[in-house]
Structure formats: structure tokens, C-alpha cells
Amino acid sequence: MGRVEEESFRNGGLGRKVVRPALGGGLGVCERSMIANGQYQKKLEDLLIVCRKNLRSVNEDLIRRAFAMSLDAHKHDLRASGEPYFLHPYEVALVVAKEIALDDVSVAAALLHDVVEDTKFELKDIRAEFGDSVADIVDGATKITDIFESHEVRQAESYRKLLLSMVNDIRVMLIKFADRLHNMRTLEYLPPDKQ
């Protein structure tokens, strides 16, 4: 699962076990090396600076944990460009924080938006670690991906009706738009038939 350390967590008097990914713990040699020499740490700090500048309030612990889980979840994956896949959710989170200026929950969800569909992590892992708000947004983004990739829904009006009926939180749509925006910004790395 990529989960690294366990810790007890008390919430409202109810004890529950939370599994937290730790930076460096379950990561590959390349990622540990990049963290050790500050490459990913610099990206995390850059994201936090953007969040502090553009968001009303920032739960830095939430963003750090989402960053760590996303990095761990995508540690072996590469994009068509050859760069680490993790840079995609990172860039989506930057769009959400800088260009849309949503909130820290949305930034965390943006970092995690591909975790459920592309890795061994499940929605229950995200819910246990980050709570219902983040998990619900990630779940909505995953469902929207399924709709966009469906060949049955072809017309814009059908998309609109279907999406609006499924989405209770507009942040789901905005994160999905940020996801598509970053994908369009990096289209040159795909073969023409995939563009």
C-alpha cells in the first residue's frame, strides 16, 4: 500500500488508527535521494509559499501529508515526458492554489486526485488519513474521470447534465479543470493520435 508508519489518533474521544505516509520511508531510492538533496523539499516549500500567499488560511500539515502520500503513491510512475508522474498532481495543486485560489482542502485533494485510480491506495486510505472533505473531492474527481473517458456520453449538454447531477461540491469540477489544464499544457509529449 505504500503506507509507512502507524500512529494512534484520537478524535472526539474515539480512538482510531491512522496510517501516515512518511517522507523518505516508503519511497524509492530516487525519491529518497531527491528529498535528501532538497529537490522535493523545495517543491513542497514552493507550494506552501503559494498557498500562504493566495489562500485565506492554510493547514500546512494537511498539505504536507497530502504531498507525502502523493509522492509515495506515484513513486514508480513516469509521465509521457519522462518526468516523475508526481509532478503532475503537484502542478495541478499549484493551479488550484495560485490560479484558482481555492482552499487548503482543495490543494490536498489536487495532490491526491490520481491516487485512487492510478495506485494501490484506496479511497478508504485517503478518508482515514485526510477525512471526508478531501476524500469526497478525490472520489468526485475519480468519477468524473470515468465519465470523461466514457464513449457513451458524447454531447456537451449530456456532459453538463451528468456532471452537475453527480457533483455536490464545485471544487471537484475546478480540480478536474486544473487537471485537464495541466494535461493540455504538456500535450507535446504525447503522440499526435493521443493529443
Q: What are these model-predicted stretches?
A:
Residues 2, 9-10, 15-195:
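Active-site helical microenvironments for divalent-metal-assisted chemistry
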